[in-house]
């Protein structure tokens, strides 16, 4: 055979294998890792076992394992035998470095659908602060550094999981911050790993014995020992064994530093030296909002953990009831709003982001109302509305079917902001007491169907809400766009007026929306259900001559329309 032709054949086979590679075929069912961290050297070394299951419909002989591009593969074995692999850089914004180190592996035999294999792996390298993916996307360097602050170092090591730093093996398709692919890739990964678990023995090496490991898992044990000593220094080591699960929507995250713990019944604050007063402010804020939070969501099932980050400008990060944040205590109200969010996470956990995250944000709006009234709560929610409108507009421009409904959405804007509004609308529709009953009857272990929570709400409210769930949960119909179509006042024999108000929803999503009729003596309010692309008429009696009708007070997320307010001419001028 002609050598050139032979080479072309080989290349074709290799390219065919590359194109056929399914990076999403395997689910990482369980990790059992020992992770050693050297803060002084910014170093990480890990070894352990990974259990993978073929969740595709076809047998799989090839797979990929990916770690941060600042780490390298040392070994990959199956049944005690080394597997040949090729490790190459893989450009993607899944990791803070803007790339992964991907090992392409060919297995000795195909793994059938639902088949399980267990690999022994070893890898290591360094984790330094790196915001390449953000600066590459045009984010200013200073802003990028405050967002992607993850690093192993002194005085604080803080490392988040997939989506920030791939410090444990993953397998995802390439994704970019320049479009929606990063959010979609992470959402698919989180959904596929929603039942996966991890056990990680996280160890540090250093010259002080005061280092602590804090992680967003369940602590199973702590072990410390002296590794060696010289006239100049003593080398210490400590290990903390954590179990994480499920890890799909809660990426394993850890911090290592000389932390001091300020412990209260509902919260533990881990602070650095000299920060006890600020730590107490966090504890006091949590204790102040706890009774109100418990009335709504029930008593916390776990403790809130606040872990101090050293740099004042770093962006806070939450993972369930754990919050990594620089201490910010000058605004007491903001602190209380932040703490009720963490307490809500501690009270209600759910495998569904629209419940877990949506309720936490809803709790913040409730606290804003508790502090300064309904208008303040609506203003709080409206600061996030432009992002939601932009996300819905972007989804509408995409050809093909609309994105999944809120019950299964992996878009952060949807399961945080839109879900917050959904909970607020449900509260306005069914009342506090009914919604509280539904929330307190929720059991995550029984949530095996997307209709589970909606059924609890409908049962507690005693009314048919299927139309609302269909528009806002099961399907993504976008946002309403309300306008006052007409308003006709009619004088009554008692000297009052009845105003026939017709509201039109130009959007596809319906809602129960408040309408307001303004008179010289004040304002009358009534609620009306307006279905998408339809009109609804409501008659409102007011004590004096009406001057204006307004639809929506901002409690329903809607596209703004200049026709949302309509002036009513005085009766004498009609």
Predicted segments with their positions:
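Acidic/His/Gly-enriched intrinsically disordered linker/tail segments
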Residues: 353-430
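Zn2+-dependent metallopeptidase catalytic core
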Residues: 48, 193, 200-211, 236-244, ...
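N-terminal, polar/Ser/Thr-rich
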Residues: 18-45, 74, 466-467, 472
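Beta-strand-rich binding/interaction modules
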Residues: 75-77, 211-214, 465, 481, ...
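A surface-exposed beta-strand-loop module
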Residues: 71-148, 185-190, 229-232, 534-545, ...
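Juxtacatalytic substrate-recognition/specificity segment
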Residues: 255-355, 359, 363, 558
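Extended, low-hydrophobicity, Ser/Thr/Pro/Gly-biased non-transmembrane segments
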Residues: 103, 119-249
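Amphipathic alpha-helical substructures
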Residues: 301, 412-495
